[in-house]
Amino acid sequence: MKNIYTWAAKPAKRTLTVADLKAAKGKRKFTQVTANSVEEADAAEKAGFDMIISNAKNVIPVREGSKNLFLTAALVLNEFVTGEDIMRGAFKAL
């Protein structure tokens, strides 16, 4: 487990970091699954997946279900009309 700081500046542990992903590029394949609920995230961690992708709206419950897996928050782009809307949504997801 790697020690990191969350976007809220709180200490946490993660199985992977961005640096790990960059270092493994071309050398290792990772597994990733979509999870949008506490139960799905918990199941993903217990099943041994490396990473989770989630709708940005569901990050809080997904993080409750999986405290340790690398999490990607995805924006649903058809919900944003302009580039400014996309940036606002991206910062809100952080």
Question: Locations of the language-model features?
Answer:
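Active-site beta->alpha loop and helix N-cap motifs at the rims of alpha/beta catalytic domains
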Residues: K2-Y5, P11, V38-L94
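N-terminal amphipathic alpha-helix/helix-capping segment at the start of soluble metabolic enzymes
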Residues: M1-V33
